[in-house]
C-alpha cells in the first residue's frame, strides 16, 4: 500500500527506477493500485472544492437545487462556482470558514455551493442565468414560484461582509416568508425589557445592547437558535438613562435575566460576538435542541483516483486542445441560452479565427469550418445555443466531422483534478492561434482579419470578456489588454505580447491556492526547455526575445503536435463510455435528456458508422429497450421521433414539415401563375384597323 501511495504522490518516481526493478515490481504495483482504486478516497483526489462530511457547506446539484431552495422553511445563500476557476479555488477557504461560522444558523439560512463545471449541472446553471464565477444568489424562504434568486450586494466578499449581508437578507423577509425557526431580529424597547424582568418565564433571557450599526446582537441571536431554555434579544443604546440604571457604561454589552428573576451584566473578557455566544451556550440547563433539518450526508464521498499520463513537456498534445474546445463549446458556452448582438458577433469572430488557424486533426478542423460557415451564412440576429450544440454534436451526420465528447488532459493534467485543466488548455489554444497567424497569415484571407496584426488577440480578448466563466480572470486580462495591446503592430509582436502577459499572470498567481505544486508557476519557457531563450545581462537573468519567438513558433507548430492519448473518431472507448453514461443516467440534465444528441452515433462520421441498416437496427434496439421501461407509450413516441427517415438523418416530423412546405409552395406558385395569366390578357395591345 505504501508503494501505491508513493506512486500516486510522485507520478515520476516510478519512471526514474531502473528497468529491472520496475519489471520486478510491476505486477505488485498494478495489484496495489487496483486495490487502492477500489477502496476509494485519495488525498486531494477529488475535483470538488467542497466535500460532504468535512465541510459545513451544503452541496447542491442539478437534481437538488430546486427542491432545496423552493418552498424551503429556511433561506439559502448559494455560491454557483466552477472548480477550475482560479478565483473560486482561492475563495473556497473563505466560503468553508463562513459555512462553519454560521453552522448554527442553518434553521434560518443555509450556506450552499453548486459546481457549474460539472457537465450534469450545465443546464441548471443556464436556467439560473449563471454566466460568471463565482456568482452568489440569495433565495428567500417559502418561495413557491421558481426564481433565479437575488444577487449578492456587498462592498466586498470578506467573511464578515457576507455574514452581515446574510442578516440583512433575513430581515428583508416579510411576515409570510419569515423562517419559523428564526427569532425576531428587530430591537426591543426599554418597556419590553422591564416586562421581561417581571415575567419570571422560567428560562434565561439575554439582551445584547449595541449601537445602531452593530451586528453583534443579531449574530448572537442567530448563534443561539439551536439551543433551548434561553431567549436572546437586542436593544439599542438610545435610552442612556435606562442603560445607566442597568449599570451599562459601554456597548456592546450583554444583560442576562435568570430563570429565577434575578438579572445582571454578563462579564466577558472581550465584548465580541464569540465571547457572548460562548458564555450563553455554557449556562446551566442551556443545551442543544432537536431541529428538523433536511438530511445532510455526514459521509465523506469517495474521490476519483487521478490516473497519471506520462507526457513530454516539450510537446503540444492534441488531446489538450480538443478537450479545451469540447469544454468551451459544450459546457462554457451552454451558460448562454441564446446569442445575439455583440455576443453573437464575438462568438462568430472567435470561431472564424479558430476554424482558420486550428492546426489539429482534419475531422476537428472540418467541424470548426462547418460551424464557421454556418454562422457566417446564418441570416439571423439571434440564435439559440441548442442550435450550435446540434451542429457540434453532428446531429445531421455530416461526413468526416468529429469532436471528442469528454475531457482528457495530458500536458494540462494536474496533480489534483481541479488544478490546471481547462484554463491551461485555453492558454495553449490562444498561443497556438497567435503562432499560426504569424507563420500562416494566408489562412485568414477572405475573413476580414487579414492584414490586422491584432485580429487574433482582439478576438481572444472579446471572447474572454464575454464568455470566460472566471469573472476576475477576465477582468485582469482586460486590464492587460487596455494597457498595451494597442502597441502590437506585427503578428510576431502579437505572439510575444501574449507570451509576456501569460508570464505576468503566472507571476501574479505564484503561491496562490490554484497553483499546482507539481507544476509551479515560474517564467516560461524554463532554461531546460529553451537554453537559448535565457541570457545574463549585468548579472541579471534576461530574455532573448528573438530566441523566445523562434521557440514559440516551433513549440506551437503543427509539427510539434502529438496525437497520443487523443480519442479516435471510431474509438470503442469513446462510444462505450457514452453508452454507459446513457444507461447509468450520467451527464443528464434535470429534464432527463442527455446533453449529447439522442443518437450517440451521430457524433461519428457516417463512413465510420457503417451501413445505414446497422444504424437503423441500433435505433430500433434502443427503442425496444425503452419500450420495456416504465415510460412505455411515451417512450415509443419519443423514440419514433428520432428514427432517421430513409437513413438520411431526418426525423418523421422533419419530413412532415417538408411535405407541408412543398404543398404550400406549389399552391402558391399555381395561384400566382393564374393571377398573372389573367392580368396579362388585359395588358395585350389591341390593334384596330381603320374603317374605309
From Swiss-Prot:
Membrane topology, record value: Single-pass membrane protein
What positions does the record give for glycosylation?
71, 172, 212, 260
Protein name per UniProt: Sulfhydryl oxidase 2
Free-text function comment from the UniProt entry: Catalyzes the oxidation of sulfhydryl groups in peptide and protein thiols to disulfides with the reduction of oxygen to hydrogen peroxide. May contribute to disulfide bond formation in a variety of secreted proteins.
Binding sites annotated in the UniProt record for FAD: 420, 427, 431, 472, 476, 499-506, 521, 524
Chief localisation class: membrane
Its family remark reads: Belongs to the quiescin-sulfhydryl oxidase (QSOX) family.
Root EC class: oxidoreductase
Cofactor(s) the record lists: FAD
Q: Which Pfam families match?
A: Evr1_Alr, FAD_SOX, QSOX_Trx1, Thioredoxin
Thioredoxin domain: from which residue to which, for each copy? 54-172
Per UniProt, which keywords does this protein have? Disulfide bond, FAD, Flavoprotein, Glycoprotein, Membrane, Oxidoreductase, Signal, Transmembrane, Transmembrane helix
Task: Cite the ERV/ALR sulfhydryl oxidase domain residue spans from the record.
Answer: 415-524
* Catalytic residues (UniProt): 85, 88
Per the UniProt record, the source organism is Mus musculus (Mouse)
Q: What is its EC number?
A: 1.8.3.2
Q: Which residues form the signal peptide?
A: 1-38
- Residue ranges under compositional bias (Basic and acidic residues)? 577-586
Transmembrane segments in this chain: where? 656-676
Q: Which PROSITE patterns match?
A: ERV_ALR (PS51324), THIOREDOXIN_2 (PS51352)
| CDD domains in the record | PDI_a_QSOX
Q: How is the cofactor bound?
A: Binds 1 FAD per subunit.
A GO CC term assigned to this protein in UniProt: membrane
Amino acid at each position: 500500500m505504501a508503494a501505491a501511495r508513493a506512486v500516486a504522490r510522485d507520478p515520476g518516481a516510478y519512471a526514474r527506477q531502473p528497468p529491472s526493478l520496475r519489471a520486478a515490481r510491476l505486477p505488485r504495483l498494478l495489484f496495489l493500485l487496483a486495490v487502492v482504486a477500489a477502496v476509494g478516497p485519495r488525498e486531494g483526489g477529488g475535483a470538488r472544492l467542497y466535500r460532504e462530511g468535512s465541510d459545513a457547506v451544503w452541496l447542491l446539484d442539478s437534481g437538488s437545487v430546486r427542491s432545496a431552495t423552493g418552498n424551503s422553511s429556511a433561506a439559502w445563500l448559494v455560491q454557483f462556482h466552477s472548480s477550475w476557476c482560479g478565483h473560486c479555488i482561492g475563495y473556497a477557504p473563505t466560503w468553508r470558514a463562513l459555512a462553519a461560522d454560521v453552522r448554527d444558523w442553518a434553521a434560518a439560512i443555509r450556506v450552499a455551493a453548486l459546481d457549474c463545471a460539472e457537465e450534469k449541472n450545465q443546464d441548471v446553471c443556464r436556467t439560473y442565468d449563471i454566466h460568471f464565477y463565482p456568482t452568489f444568489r440569495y433565495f428567500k424562504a417559502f418561495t413557491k414560484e421558481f426564481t433565479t434568486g437575488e444577487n449578492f450586494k456587498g462592498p466586498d466578499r470578506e467573511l464578515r461582509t457576507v455574514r452581515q449581508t446574510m442578516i440583512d437578507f433575513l430581515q428583508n423577509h416579510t411576515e409570510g416568508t419569515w423562517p419559523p425557526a428564526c427569532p425576531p431580529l428587530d430591537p426591543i424597547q426599554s418597556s419590553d425589557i422591564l416586562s421581561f424582568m417581571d415575567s419570571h418565564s422560567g428560562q434565561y433571557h439575554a439582551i445584547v445592547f449595541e449601537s445602531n450599526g452593530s451586528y453583534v446582537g443579531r449574530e448572537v441571536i442567530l448563534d443561539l437558535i439551536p439551543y433551548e431554555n434561553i431567549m436572546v434579544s437586542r436593544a439599542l443604546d438610545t435610552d442612556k438613562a435606562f442603560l445607566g440604571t442597568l449599570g451599562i457604561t459601554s456597548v456592546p454589552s450583554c444583560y442576562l435575566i435568570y430563570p429565577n428573576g434575578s438579572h445582571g451584566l454578563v462579564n466577558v473578557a472581550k465584548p465580541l460576538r464569540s465571547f457572548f455566544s460562548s458564555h450563553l451556550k455554557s449556562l446551566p440547563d442551556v443545551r442543544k435542541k432537536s431541529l428538523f433539518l433536511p438530511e445532510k450526508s455526514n459521509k465523506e464521498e469517495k474521490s476519483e483516483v487521478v490516473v497519471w499520463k506520462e507526457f513530454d513537456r516539450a510537446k503540444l498534445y492534441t488531446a489538450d486542445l480538443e478537450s479545451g474546445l469540447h469544454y468551451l463549446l459544450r459546457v462554457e458556452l451552454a451558460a448562454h441560452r441564446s446569442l445575439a448582438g455583440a455576443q453573437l458577433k464575438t462568438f462568430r469572430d472567435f470561431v472564424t479565427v479558430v476554424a482558420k488557424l486550428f492546426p489539429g486533426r482534419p475531422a476537428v478542423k472540418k467541424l470548426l469550418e462547418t460551424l464557421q460557415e454556418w454562422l457566417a451564412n446564418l441570416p439571423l440576429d439571434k440564435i439559440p445555443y441548442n442550435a450550435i450544440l446540434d451542429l457540434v454534436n453532428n446531429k445531421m451526420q455530416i461526413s468526416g466531422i468529429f469532436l471528442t465528447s469528454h475531457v482528457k488532459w495530458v500536458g494540462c493534467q494536474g496533480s489534483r483534478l481541479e488544478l490546471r485543466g481547462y484554463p491551461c488548455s485555453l492558454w495553449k489554444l490562444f498561443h497556438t492561434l497567435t503562432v499560426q497567424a504569424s507563420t500562416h497569415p494566408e489562412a485568414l484571407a477572405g475573413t476580414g482579419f487579414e492584414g490586422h496584426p491584432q485580429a487574433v488577440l482582439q478576438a481572444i480578448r472579446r471572447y474572454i470578456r464575454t464568455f470566460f466563466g472566471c469573472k476576475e480572470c477576465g477582468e485582469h486580462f482586460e486590464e492587460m489588454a487596455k494597457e498595451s495591446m494597442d502597441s502590437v503592430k506585427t503578428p510576431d509582436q502579437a505572439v510575444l505580447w501574449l507570451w509576456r502577459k501569460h508570464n505576468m499572470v503566472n507571476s501574479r498567481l505564484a503561491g496562490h491556492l490554484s497553483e499546482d505544486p507539481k507544476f509551479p508557476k515560474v517564467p516560461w519557457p524554463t532554461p531546460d526547455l529553451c537554453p537559448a531563450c535565457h541570457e545574463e545581462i549585468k548579472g541579471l537573468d534576461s530574455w532573448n526575445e528573438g530566441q523566445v519567438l523562434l521557440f514559440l513558433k516551433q513549440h506551437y507548430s503543427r509539427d510539434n503536435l502529438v496525437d497520443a492519448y487523443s480519442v479516435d473518431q471510431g474509438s470503442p472507448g469513446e462510444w462505450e463510455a457514452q453508452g454507459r453514461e446513457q444507461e447509468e443516467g450520467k451527464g443528464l440534465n434535470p429534464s432527463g435528456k442527455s446533453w449529447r444528441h439522442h443518437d450517440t452515433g451521430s457524433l461519428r462520421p457516417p463512413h465510420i458508422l457503417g451501413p445505414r441498416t446497422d444504424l437503423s437496427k441500433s435505433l430500433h434496439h434502443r427503442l425496444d429497450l425503452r419500450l420495456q421501461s416504465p415510460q412505455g407509450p411515451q417512450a415509443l413516441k419519443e423514440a419514433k421521433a428520432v428514427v432517421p427517415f430513409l437513413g438520411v438523418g431526418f426525423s418523421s416530423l422533419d419530413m412532415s414539415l417538408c411535405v407541408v412546405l412543398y404543398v404550400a409552395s406549389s399552391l402558391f406558385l399555381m395561384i400566382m401563375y393564374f393571377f398573372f395569366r389573367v392580368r396579362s390578357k388585359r395588358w395585350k395591345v389591341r390593334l384596330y384597323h381603320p374603317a374605309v
